Structure formats: C-alpha cells, structure tokens
Amino acid sequence: MVYRSFVRVLALTTVVSGWTRLDVGSITSWQVDNKASPGAQQTSPTANPSASEIESNPWAKARPYFEKPFPDLRANVPELKGLAPATSQDPLTYILDRAGEKCVDLLSRIPNVISREEVTTLVPKPPRMGVSIEPYIGIQREKFDYLLLSKHTESGTKLEEYRMVNGRPATTATALGQLSQGFTSEWLRIYPGNRSESRFRYLGQQMMDQHHVFVLGFAQIPESVRFPARFQLPGKEVAIFLQGVMWIDSRDFRILRMREDLLVPRPDIGLKKFTTTIRFGEVNIAKAGSSLWLPQEVVIEWEFKTQTVQRRHRYSDYRLYVAKAKVLPATP
C-alpha cells in the first residue's frame, strides 16, 4: 500500500521590490506499506473531495488533453514535437508494469540524500507596462540544501522532503517559496498501488534527450484521488486535479521527464495555468552501492489573475546525508 499526503499551496503574501510575491509549492509525504504487494489497491485515511465539491467545480466534466486530436494535443504540449503517434493501446499495460517495477526497486534502495538547490523566480513585466530593457518586475535567486529522508520501518517506508538554510528548515521569513517541494518523489505517481487514481493513454514514441522513449499521457480521476492537490488562498482552500505527460526510457523504463498541468483552468479563483516540468537523471552517489534516479531540474510556470510567474529549481551535488549528533557532558 502506498498513500500520499500531497498539498500544493498558492498563497498571496507580501510585496517584494514592487511586485506581489506568490508562494507556490507542495508538501509531500509518501508512506509505503511493506506488507502489501506492489500491485495492491491502496487503502488509507481518505481525504477525497466531497461529492458536492466535485459537482460544484469545473473538473467534474473535464476532458483531458490526451483525448483531443493530435494537433490540439501538441498545441497544449509543445514538447511532443516529433512524436510518432501510437496506433494501438496494446503496449500500455506492459509499459506501466515495467515502469512500476522500477519505482518499486528505487523505493527499496533510496537512502537519505541531500543536494544543492538553486531556485530562480521570475515575474515577467505585463505587456501593458510597455517595452523596456528589463523584461522582469522581479527576479529572486536563492540557494538551499535539499534533503530527502527515507525512513524504513516494519510498517512501511516514508519519504520526507525538506529545504534547509544553514542547517535549519527554510521558512517564509528567510526564503521565498519554501513550500515548493515534493519533486524528488513525484515518480511515485506510477507506483503500482497509485495507478488507480489516474487514467493513462499510450501516446507513442519519440526521441527525448538522446533517448528513445515511450510517451504516456495521464489524467487524475477526481473521485479516486485520496489526497488531491489543494490551493490555499486567503480564507479559502480549493482542490486541484492534474493531467500530464511522462516520457519513459524504452531501454530501462525509467522516467526521463514529466509534465503536469491543471486538469482544467480555474477562472473562478483566477488560476489560469499551473505547469510543472521535471527532468530526471541518473545520480551516482559514493557509498550508496548503486545509482539512483532523481530530479536534475524542475520548472514551474503559473498564471494567477494578472501575473505570470516562472520558478526554476536546479539540483546538483547529490550525496548521502548522515545526521550528526554531539554528546555533551552532563551539567553539574
């Protein structure tokens, strides 16, 4: 059994250097039950949206973009340029099963790791402000240590992610967007026990980053998602459901890239777009015993009311994390 507590947060905060600061991100906690088979149906404390919530929101009758004609799909996802469209859905189950096996294997081996993270947030200047040499209202660059803890117990495995500044958890008082996290475990979306929360479509084959890849589309099923992403606005919290595309290496069935979009825009709250693109890569860590598969870069773009914002996360120098403890003599 795998269950996930996953919250994306969009919150208006302060004004920084003349532009409104937007904190966007996710808090992610994965729990994997060692006693359940990898393909078992998930069971967990439910946090599903209510029936009234589903009926009152636009995703109730949402049509994923992978159901649209191919030219429209490619317009939604420009990264699909060069895709050879699938003529059959027969390979879908095989691809999902093999990719799921990779998730199970990685989860069993992943240790506590830490990396360097560079975060750049850009707020482009709206067109109404005219042409100028500086195309951005605000630019902010920050550096962190990004920590992924893998806790193996008799009841299961739990993945927790933290952003650190000088050895302490980052907070909004010291860093912009401290909630933008959750990327290193995003591949668990296709863990066998999680597949029932989404619909999948085999889209075809493509060359991506010099790899031959299988391309899959996915869309969350609102009534099946136990812990939907939720956007938090002043005095209001709304559920958000996602669709996307994943590019899976045809040689070893590891995810090379993932793209996630809103299942439908939310004009009722001013959220027109929220797109996350994750690029994964092989990471060789000394003393880890084998290679891992972790994010190299994450790009988030969103349009909220009148602002368009882009945030880029780059990860490097992955290494084992070992907590240090210091024994102090007893005070007389």
Model-derived features with residue positions:
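Structured extracytoplasmic
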Residues: 30, 35, 39-243, 250-257, ...
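Sec-dependent N-terminal signal peptides
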Residues: 1-31
